Design a protein with these regions (language model features):
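C-terminal accessory module of base-excision DNA glycosylases/AP lyases that mediates lesion recognition
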Residues: 1-30, 95-96, 100, 118-119, ...
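Alpha-helical ds-nucleic-acid-binding substructure associated with the helix-hairpin-helix region
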Residues: 18-20, 25, 52, 56-128, ...
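Short, solvent-exposed helix-loop connector elements
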Residues: 30-32, 124
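Short, flexible turn/loop "capping" segments at secondary-structure junctions
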Residues: 35-40, 77
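Residue-level detector of well-ordered alpha-helical segments, enriched
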Residues: 38, 42-43, 55-59, 94-97, ...
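Short, aromatic/basic-rich helix-turn unit that serves as a nucleic-acid recognition element
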Residues: 42, 46, 50
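A broad detector of the eukaryotic-type serine/threonine protein kinase catalytic domain
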Residues: 47, 68, 82, 103-110, ...
Length: 201
């Protein structure tokens, strides 16, 4: 057994015989509990919608290079029209979504406001933004709020990994994926990290 595995990974290895070999092959994957900047995270999530990880990374790097920034900041976008945002290499809907994120952010008392809400309140807030659906909310909860117990059945890569491992049947509906993920509670996010790593490796 790899001594570097943390409590969450040891729990998953013990409780899921199908996931255990994946974790052992992957080795330890770090999940930081440090919250990230909400605006930057929302922009990254919007860019990542409906495209591969590789394509999303390339678009992010290209936009950040144009802005000469390391992270997405409101000041870089706030004076841009939807058309100008689209010209950064994004679809019209993603440009509209980013524009709406800026408008939404401007109305909040502070960037940490979103962390002060309950999970349900936060979800309601985020779903009010154009272009933000349940998958985006799940990704925000994982990678911005750093919630350790999130699974997103709306994520195609996670479904692919679970199907390949025989966790669900080919004709399974989304609730079947959600039901299977219950055995990972309270470490669903760590399980997702390993499934994504499996697909990307």
């Amino acid at each position: 057994m790899n001594k570097a595995f943390v409590k969450s990974e040891l729990f998953l290895i013990k409780n899921d015989k199908l996931l255990a070999p994946v974790i052992k092959k992957n080795g330890h994957l770090t999940f930081s509990n440090k919250k990230t900047d909400p605006f930057n995270e929302l922009i990254e999530i919007v860019i990542s919608q409906f495209i591969s990880t590789k394509a999303a990374k390339a678009i992010k790097q290209n936009i950040l290079s144009r802005f000469k920034e390391d992270n997405f900041k409101i000041k870089s976008f706030e004076k841009l029209s939807i058309s100008q945002i689209k010209n950064l290499g994004l679809s019209n809907n993603k440009a509209k979504s980013i524009s709406d994120i800026i408008a939404w952010s401007d109305l909040k008392p502070s960037k940490n406001y979103i962390f002060e809400l309950s999970r349900d309140e936060r979800e309601k807030e985020l779903l009010s933004i154009f272009g933000i659906g349940q998958w985006s909310v799940d990704m925000f909860e994982m990678f911005c709020v750093r919630n350790a117990n999130i699974f997103s059945s709306g994520d195609a890569a996670l479904r692919q990994a679970m199907l390949e491992l025989g966790m669900v049947k080919k004709e399974a509906n989304l609730s079947s994926y959600d039901n299977y993920s219950k055995k990972w509670n309270p470490y669903k996010t760590q399980a997702c990290l390993h499934l994504w790593h499996m697909i990307e490796s």
